[in-house]
Amino acid sequence: MASSSTLLNDDWKQGLAAPPKDLRPQTEDVTATQGSRFEDFGLRRELLMGIYTAGFERPSPIQEQAIPMALTGRDILARAKNGTGKTASFIIPTLNRINTSLSHIQALILVPTRELALQTSQVCKTLGAHIPNLQVMITTGGTTLRDDILRLQQPVHILVGTPGRILDLGSKGIASLNKCGVFVMDEADKLLSEDFMPVIEQTLALCPQERQVMLFSATFPWTVKEFKDQHMVQPYEINLMDELTLKGVTQYYAYVEESQKVHCLNTLFSKLQINQSIIFCNSTNRVELLAKKVTELGYSCFYSHAKMQQAHRNRVFHDFRNGMTRNLVCSDLLTRGIDIQAVNVVINFDFPRTAESYLHRIGRSGRFGHLGLAISLLTLEDRHNLYRIESELGTEIAPIPAVIDPVLYVAPAMVEEERESPPPKPAAIAAPPAQQQPQQRQRQHPPVPSHQAAQQSPAAAPVQQQQQQQQQQQQQQQQQQPQYQQAYGQGPPQPQALFQQQPNSSPAPAPLPSYSQQAPTQAQGPAPVQSPPPAPSTQPQAPAQTPIQGQIPPTQPRAQQQGQQQPGQPGQAQGQSQPNRRPNTGGFRGNGRGQGHRGRGRGRGGQPGQPGAGAGAGQSQQAQA
């Protein structure tokens, strides 16, 4: 192995295809280090190449403390905040220890969820991309054992999976763990709960006595101490939790009636500068229902929960990670370990029941020291949980203000562009496309020289007068427009000033407001130049292929859906299909006899009427073919 000085003198970094440098500011959660570099740890050259190719620049505090001790083979018990680099803290020393000339399993990494297993295995492959003949295998529940059996017949160096499947493979002799020298548990607090503890102990018994055990998590309950006393040998303890919540995540709450949560969610989408967002619900049924509502508002949206097929869950996670959509509705399935740095907004549509769940939810934003925003929609029944979670986490969740400053959750460069650009006019008073075209052409053409501008000045005066007249007319129309309460009574309750305006929507007293045909555009980056009304969805979406459960393509608003909805595919919004009817040409009368129901019979295709389908008076009517 080359020494640190040799690595520093060589120009091996110049040929690496590193990604563009991330210029976003970072908080002290990842910058408060002692100035160490990855070269100072004595890592192998191939591993260093993978680290810098992946975009790593300097180790974070947890990496700076955990990697050197893990390289010595000592047991590690590390506690650090979400999104501060815990995954690389155990993968880097594990990869440095792997001997690819041996064909047996040398490291076992256990995680609580399938999505986290998929992400962890991908990180292993990315960081070890330059290590020759490195073999990483992932195995989780929801897949057939046959594929795992065939894969384990080949050399496997690192095995990543969920506890149940790992124990199944090990107890049946399919996966040999008797030479596995590294035993890692990510999200150890979850793995050492009552549900997983028996499985973990049985799996650990399959490993040799001379092993290295490493535990990483953001929270450590009392069960972790019991496991440490029984199965770990003088572990090196790391605790970087001066506070539980991330410093870069701003937390707000808003009291909202249950029937108006979707209405408030639409307002947040219209006002916030969302790069990507994750919306959490407390049950799988509410996940699918909310995903359908978000789609009806005109926003592209995927959903994921534990009852979906594993292939569909993997596809949704992969597409959301690659930016195929901006919004993901999910349950607590994705609260642990999921690292998507493009997510800057987390919305608790249902307030979590425990402080642990709340901590992991808001940790999906503000990853690796970046800025993030967490907003919780509360009902009156949730106020007790709010006080309890604040006291347990030692944090303060503030009421949502009238205006949320983008500086709190958006990169400064994007905020400056937003402020330099003129704000867009509301959709209700926006100028027609014909009036916007001259302004667009004026922005597209280069500046006119001064001598030509003098010649064009007489013609420019009428244009300016015309624009002033248009602005005055728009202001008059806005003043004459009926107010919300005058037209619809008291309307839905608006607990905070943020929800007073209804951008790009037509208010209605129903629990779910009916929205205009022009779907609201989710704010992103600098304000766009005025243009004709956009399509119902401006967000990226997956290509039209075989429907995947959990992926809901954007639909038209309700005003455009009458008579056009088709029966939904699995995982898509189930629309009420309308039968194709031709004019009545004197078909046969229905017999009015339903199976167990009495209703009006309807003939189909000119044939004798079928049994009545509705609960009616039992009298047949003129059939419609």
UniProtKB/Swiss-Prot annotation:
Residue span(s) of domain Helicase ATP-binding: 67-238
Any one annotated GO CC term: P-body
Function: ATP-dependent RNA helicase involved in mRNA turnover, and more specifically in mRNA decapping. Is involved in G1/S DNA-damage checkpoint recovery, probably through the regulation of the translational status of a subset of mRNAs. May also have a role in translation and mRNA nuclear export.
Cited Pfam families: DEAD, Helicase_C
Extent of motif Q motif: 36-64
CDD domains associated with the record: DEADc_DDX6, SF2_C_DEAD
Disordered, as annotated region: 1-34, 416-625
Domain Helicase C-terminal residues, every copy: 248-408
Biased composition (Low complexity): 427-441, 450-505, 513-528, 538-586
Sorted UniProt keywords: ATP-binding, Cytoplasm, Helicase, Hydrolase, mRNA processing, mRNA transport, Nucleotide-binding, RNA-binding, Translation regulation, Transport
UniProt subcellular location: Cytoplasm, P-body
InterPro entries: DEAD/DEAH_box_helicase_dom, Helicase_ATP-bd, Helicase_C-like, P-loop_NTPase, RNA-helicase_DEAD-box_CS, RNA_helicase_DEAD_Q_motif
Gly residues bias (residue ranges): 604-617
Single biological process term from Gene Ontology: P-body assembly
Domains: entry comment: The Q motif is unique to and characteristic of the DEAD box family of RNA helicases and controls ATP binding and hydrolysis.
Reaction it catalyzes: ATP + H2O = ADP + phosphate + H(+)
The protein's name: ATP-dependent RNA helicase DHH1
